[in-house]
Amino acid sequence: MLPKVETEALGLARSNGEQGQMPENMQVSQFKMVNYSYDEDLEELCPVCGDKVSGYHYGLLTCESCKGFFKRTVQNNKRYTCIENQNCQIDKTQRKRCPYCRFQKCLSVGMKLEAVRADRMRGGRNKFGPMYKRDRALKQQKKALIRANGLKLEAMTQVIQAMPTDLTISSAIQNIHSASKGLPLNHTALPPTDYDRSPFVTSPISMTMPPHGSLQGYQTYGHFPSRAIKSEYPDPYTSSPESIMGYSYMDGYQTSSPASIPHLILELQKCEPDEPQVQAKIMAYLQQEQANRSKHEKLNTFGLMCKMADQTLFSIVEWARSSIFFRELKVDDQMKLLQNCWSELLILDHIYRQVVHVKEGSILLVTGQQVDYSVIASQAGATLNNLMSHAQELVAKLRSLQFDLREFVCLKFLVLFSLDVKNLENFQLVEGVQEQVNAALLDYTMCNYPQQTDKFGQLLLRLPEIRAISMQAEEYLYCKHLNGDVPCNNLLIEMLHAKRA
């Protein structure tokens, strides 16, 4: 039985976070202030019919009407038919005209069948409780800020200048503190971020995915007669990459055309989060968190890093929950997979960021800021220095392999859909994803890196190394937690406790 706190934590892709501070020499976003009405864009609308939401029902924010409709349909085991073409428009004025299309839309936007009680008693199967509380708190915080200030900050588009590189962690902490006082921040322009997007809303990609049983619709890579699988999708990664905020997950090595990229890999790539937006969310969270702290409550270096890791973990959970194939799994299977690999995904994310970071002797933070490796090493103990050393060795190996974005995406899915996880209800899907991604990765490496005849095998050999580093990192973090050095009430700690339950 999973501990309650952990079960709820994984029902969530939280964008609300906890605090820290950022390097000093950051290019400041220029903001313009405009009149802002609270109702303008904070008022939530039901994703099914567009009516005003009444609260969280069966997995996401919906209106009272769609909540009742969904509950009655599931509890009464109703079966509907559509007299048209099963694509009826569902909105507030005609949501009752076609119950079949309405129910299908409920499912497509993310309402959870398993959250409805079969015994007709009041109260759902609430695996998402703390998510609701956190999300409500975030919305209330936004409302309070807007009402207090009466303005809306809009990041103005501007030419992005190169980030300074001589940054230290201490200056990072000072920078957030300055932001809370209204002092200039050397921070690049942040794109508007969608903090209130529900993690349960179905993405356009996942709605077009085939049934998961056979993974039909994707190229089967049992044989490789042509080594060139054409795709109708444009490939945004073949153009020359440009860093938006100090870094982006660009493709630093290969320049292959979409014709030489397996269709499955292109689909996996589409699931990747927008890195500048992730950076903006984490930065905004750290700034807000620091602004809420008194002078004597500022985070130390380690606390800051924990906050960054916690927010990165939330973005990883959100990525997983919105990804193809993973969405097809029931919540229990999703939780088991994420429980198993969360630290590996964190390490892999950090490793790839360093691979594409070109400056030697510095570490690229998830916020896009660079910190001298020597600065971190001087403040870290023997255990953390050992972990950092192993991570840098792995970075060097992957750089020598010319590790690129598409291979990174494949490894993320191989880590997520691990065959080591026991008692999965839909093990067949997990096994199928493993086989298909492995085959696509093999095809891709052979086609695009023919001079590296064993690149596929070398990439797979890095996975045990990532796991070893992640296990050491977990042990280190847990010991620090027991000593009271890790900020409490965050997803990192919830996951650590869950894994030891």
UniProtKB/Swiss-Prot annotation:
One of its GO terms (biological process) is somatic stem cell population maintenance. It is found in: Nucleus; Chromosome. GO terms for cellular component: chromosome; RNA polymerase II transcription regulator complex. The C-terminal extension (CTE) loop competes with a DNA minor groove anchor of the nucleosome and releases entry-exit site DNA, thereby promoting opening of closed chromatin. A motif (FTZ-F1 box) lies at residues 128-147. The keyword Zinc applies. Zn(2+) 2 binds at residues 82, 88, 98, 101. PANTHER family: NUCLEAR RECEPTOR SUBFAMILY 5 GROUP A, NUCLEAR RECEPTOR SUBFAMILY 5 GROUP A MEMBER 2. Residues 112-127 are annotated as: C-terminal extension (CTE). Residues 260-499 form the NR LBD domain. Residues 186-207 are annotated as: Disordered. Detected in liver and adrenal gland. SMART domains: HOLI, ZnF_C4. SUPFAM superfamilies: Glucocorticoid receptor-like (DNA-binding domain), Nuclear receptor ligand-binding domain. Residues 488-499 are annotated as: AF-2. Belongs to the nuclear hormone receptor family. NR5 subfamily. Zn(2+) 1 binds at residues 46, 49, 63, 66. Monomer; Binds DNA as a monomer. It comes from the Eukaryota. This is Nuclear receptor subfamily 5 group A member 2. GO terms for molecular function: nuclear receptor activity; RNA polymerase II cis-regulatory region sequence-specific DNA binding; zinc ion binding. Keywords: Activator, Chromosome, DNA-binding, Metal-binding, Nucleus, Receptor, Transcription, Transcription regulation, Zinc, Zinc-finger. The keyword Nucleus applies.
